[in-house]
Amino acid sequence: MAQLYFYYSAMNAGKSTSLLQSSYNYNERGMRTLVFTAEIDTRFENGKVNSRIGLSSDALLFSQQTDIGELIRNENKQAKVHCVLIDECHFLTKAQIEQICKVTDYDDIPVLCYGLRTDFRGELFSGSQYLLAWADKLVELKTICYCGRKANRVLRFDSEGAAIYDGEQVDIGGNEKYVSVCRKHYMEAINEARKNRKDSV
């Protein structure tokens, strides 16, 4: 019986690398996979999943308006789909999570989702919230803070290198804008940013 998996982490834990390896494993056995990534993520070439170690794969794009369930079923009618892999799944909506649950339950296709658990404020993304609630399997992919502890938070920085603790949830960027840290160093950076803001008023 197919299951819905949520592989989550902070940034730079190898989520895309893990997705690409899983897709390769299916393909090597002659099985067809569908790979999705978020249209909003413009860090790399559009229509591709790219890993920091240089691996890449073509991908179907999704926006918040995409009916992923219908798209998967149409592809499955053309040629059997053995597994669906979704990168940047934190950008999925509640309705889209419901759609992929139905794909798993009624079409018997495993769905592997890879994404961030929380944003730079430490708050859940909508997609992550419902995957944490509804996925059959939750798998944490680990990365480390500069101190060596497990990194479970993401800091966002402004153009001058100062930590930011408010603003829009989505602001696409890479290592120049975000860094994964442990809770202790996240709180220290945020408290310092709040202190500096207060001092400048």
UniProtKB/Swiss-Prot annotation:
It is found in: Cytoplasm. The active site is at E88 (proton acceptor). It holds the Pfam family TK. InterPro entries: P-loop_NTPase (IPR027417), Thymidine_kinase (IPR001267), Thymidine_kinase_CS (IPR020633). GO terms for molecular function: ATP binding; thymidine kinase activity; zinc ion binding. Its EC number is 2.7.1.21. Its main location: cytoplasm. It comes from the Bacteria. One of its GO terms (biological process) is DNA biosynthetic process. It is an enzyme of class 2 (transferase). Zn(2+) binds at C145, C147, C182, H185. It catalyses: thymidine + ATP = dTMP + ADP + H(+). One of its GO terms (cellular component) is cytosol. Keywords: ATP-binding, Cytoplasm, DNA synthesis, Kinase, Metal-binding, Nucleotide-binding, Transferase, Zinc. ATP binds at S9, A10, M11, N12, A13, G14, K15, S16, D87, E88, C89, H90. HAMAP family: Thymidine_kinase. Homotetramer. PANTHER family: THYMIDINE KINASE, THYMIDINE KINASE, CYTOSOLIC. Belongs to the thymidine kinase family. This is Thymidine kinase. The lineage of its organism: Bacteria, Pseudomonadati, Pseudomonadota, Gammaproteobacteria, Enterobacterales.
